[in-house]
Amino acid sequence: MTNYTHVAGRVHADQASDDWWREAVIYQIYPKPWADSNGDGIGDLNGVRQNLEYLAELGVDAIWFSPFFVGPQTDGGYDVADYRDIDPMFGTLADAEALIREAHRVGLKIIIDVVPNHTSVAHRFFKAALSTPPGSPEWQRYHLVRGQGEHGELPPNDWVSIFSGPAWTQTHFAGQPTGYWYLHIFDAGQPDVNWNHPDIVDEFDHTLRFWFDRGVDGFRIDVAHGLVDRKSTRLNSSH
């Protein structure tokens, strides 16, 4: 799937203003179905790189990449396990760096999706949380709340996820239910992170710096409206 946005006239490659994106022609690419360079039936970064001049000739100013990070890929790549590496189905980090260099050579800018509202259950932070008992420091990186009922066997409240069904999934430790549930506004494989925790802030600060260092020109922040201070939110109450 691809789509593009023509905001206004074409932006010149030498435009130095930080506001370049306001008038840019931005073309979105989901890598998986876009261009396959090696015949395995899956679009990849090298496939995009081979078509950069074509995109420039169309009048595109910038490419907005939907996630190409390592992850289970159960939600189109928006379930990220490693924000600083490329999923092997799309190529390698070296492929990404080569694509960015070539894009700049032909006058294109690169924007990538960053997903800071949640991680994948395969992210090292979440795996660390589930490998420790309730109340551990690792738990504090996510929204883990005691359930209702004598043993916490019921969800903390009646919140419904955007993908339907409860916005809570019960956790287990040593094979037994803990009575604690984690919040996921989207799929159960996408636990919401706690932006009040310094480890989360550091993780995404490092991620943005990592990609800026590799030449990325900007970011599209997924679920930006979800990045709010939740200290005052009663996660164990109903709407």
Predicted regions and their residues:
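Acidic/aromatic-lined carbohydrate-recognition and catalytic surfaces
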Residues: 2-205, 209, 213, 225-234
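Receiver (REC) domain switch/active-site residues of two-component response regulators
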Residues: 217
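Short "domain-exit" segments at the C-terminal end of structured domains
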Residues: 235-239
